[in-house]
Regions:
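Core dinuclear metal-dependent hydrolase active-site scaffold
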Residues: 1-46, 113-164, 236-242
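Glycine/Thr-rich phosphate-binding loops of Rossmann-like dinucleotide-binding domains
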Residues: 13, 41, 65-66, 100, ...
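Active-site neighborhood of phospho(di)ester-bond hydrolases with catalytic His/Asp-centered motifs
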Residues: 32-36, 53-63, 92-93, 150-156, ...
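Active-site metal-binding motif and surrounding structural segment of the metallo-beta-lactamase
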Residues: 38-87, 168-170
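Metal-dependent catalytic neighborhoods of phosphoester/phosphodiester hydrolases
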Residues: 67-75, 99-102, 216-224
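P-loop/Walker A phosphate-binding loop and immediately adjacent motor/lid segment at beta-alpha junctions
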Residues: 71-89, 137, 144, 184-207, ...
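Extended hydrophobic secondary-structure segments that form protein cores and membrane-embedded regions
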Residues: 88-94, 113
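Cap/insert and terminal regions of metallo-dependent hydrolase folds
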Residues: 159-239
């Protein structure tokens, strides 16, 4: 499996950046997950969206799904042109917010709500979802192609579910939305240090994403070192092998 990062920032992007948007590829399958600000043009340039097998949304905050609207518009046009034949499958948590309803109501999408402990299969990929610690319903997941396992923590502060998601994975993508100086247990995100410590605890290689654009990259790298984990800072428009 391979994971491509098209947006690594949150809760908003810097100039020429994008918020959370990723694509997971296996031998048979292309699954996008998260589709934040700037996602459509970047993802569609590398992986035509009409050929994607599914889109997973961890939760309904704008920095994770804001480009779903233009994605829906594009798919409707592609249907009219014959470039796409079926609605794009979206897997997401149950949420009745106005934002979620706006996305779920678009005719371009076929939406399936999933929850804690649910499992789905998309061609050769098997996913298991876990509820994580965020102010709105939010899911992380583990996915395997039968050989390797990739873990995504979603947006989350510390919680037991992250241990279940990350333990034994070959590669993890973790929310390092805060530097430790700005973090406490009531915040909506992990610190970079906390991500690094979590990776060390489980002996897992990790990519730190959901980075605040106001933070200095050097500070982020220093905090990874303090945590002691085998971690790298996410780079946009880069592909990593699981």
């Amino acid at each position: 499996m391979k994971i491509s990062i098209f947006g690594k920032y949150g809760p908003y992007p810097p100039l020429n950046g994008a918020t959370s948007s990723y694509v997971l590829n296996s031998k048979q399958t292309t699954v996008a997950f998260e589709f934040g600000s700037g996602a459509f043009s970047r993802v569609n340039n590398s992986f035509p969206v009409e050929k994607s097998d599914a889109l997973i949304l961890s939760h309904f905050h704008f920095d994770h799904c804001s480009d779903c609207g233009v994605l829906g518009y594009a798919l409707l046009r592609y249907y009219a042109l014959g470039k796409a034949k079926e609605p794009l499958k979206i897997y997401c948590p149950k949420d009745n917010s106005p934002l979620s309803q706006a996305i779920k109501s678009m005719k371009a999408f076929s939406v399936t709500e999933v929850g804690d402990g649910d499992e789905i299969t998309v061609k050769d990929l098997k996913f298991k979802f876990y509820a994580v610690n965020h102010p709105v319903p939010c899911l992380g997941f583990r996915v395997t192609d039968g050989e390797k396992t990739f873990a995504y923590g979603g947006d989350s502060n510390e919680c037991a579910a992250l241990d279940k998601i990350i333990g034994g994975a070959d590669l993890a993508l973790l929310d390092g939305g805060l530097l430790y100086r700005d973090w406490n247990e009531n915040k909506p995100h992990l610190s970079v240090k906390g991500c690094s410590q979590l990776a060390k605890k489980h002996g897992v290689k990790a990519i730190i994403t959901h980075l605040n654009p106001e933070y200095d990259k050097g500070e982020i790298i220093d905090e990874i070192a303090v945590g002691g984990g085998d971690c790298v800072v996410a780079e946009e428009n880069k592909t990593y092998t699981v």
